[in-house]
Regions:
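GST-like domain detector, emphasizing the conserved glutathione-binding G-site
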Residues: 1-63
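Non-transmembrane alpha-helical segments in soluble domains
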Residues: 7, 11, 31-34, 76, ...
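Surface-exposed helix-capping loop/turn segments at secondary-structure junctions
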Residues: 16, 81-94, 137-141
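All-alpha amphipathic helical-bundle segments outside canonical DNA-binding/catalytic cores
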Residues: 19-29, 68, 88-101
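GST superfamily/GST-like fold recognition
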Residues: 44, 48, 93-118, 131-134, ...
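Residue-level preference for long, well-ordered alpha-helices that form the structural scaffold
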Residues: 60-71, 121
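Amphipathic alpha-helical packing segments from all-alpha helical-bundle domains
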Residues: 66-85
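Long hydrophobic alpha-helical segments typical of transmembrane helices together
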Residues: 121-150
Length: 150
């Protein structure tokens, strides 16, 4: 039921390009980036939290948007700092092929755009997101490409 565990399971059991680097240091870095997104940024900005803010706490839409924008900015600032200028950051979060980290980054930026978060302060993240968007696998996984998309 946890996305990172499912992705790692599929990576280990299915043929195709690996989503984790071959070296232990690279794997640790990719996991740190992915977990930073999945464990630090996403949980406080998911739909369940926003519904609780509005329902149980009576937050207005403006207050929920302020919450979302604040926490997304805080998380993306840290992620941009982690990736920008790092010698292993290349076309993607780690190297020149997509990794588990990129699989986490792309949906987080999709959600940030959905909530009209300004993203200009994150040029490294935007560059990586654009590189992912060029790939058929990311195009096919995009929310709008799903059968149940509205």
């Amino acid at each position: 039921t946890q996305s990172l565990a499912i992705i790692e399971y599929l990576d280990e059991t299915q043929p195709g390009p690996a989503l984790l680097p071959a070296d232990a240091v690279g794997r640790a870095r990719v996991r740190a980036i992915a977990q930073g997104i999945a464990c630090d940024i996403h949980p406080i900005n998911n739909l369940r939290v926003l519904q609780y803010l509005g329902g149980q706490l009576g937050a207005t839409q403006e207050q929920k948007d302020a919450w979302y924008h604040h926490w997304i900015a805080t998380g993306l600032q840290g992620l941009e700092a982690m990736l920008a200028g790092h010698p292993d950051t290349d076309r993607f979060c780690h190297g020149d092929t997509p990794t588990l980290a990129d699989c986490c980054l792309v949906p987080q930026l999709f959600n940030a755009r959905r909530f009209n978060c300004p993203l200009d302060a994150y040029p490294t993240l935007l560059r990586i997101d654009a590189a992912c968007a060029e790939l058929p696998a990311f195009q096919q996984a995009a929310p709008g490409a799903q059968a149940d998309a509205e």
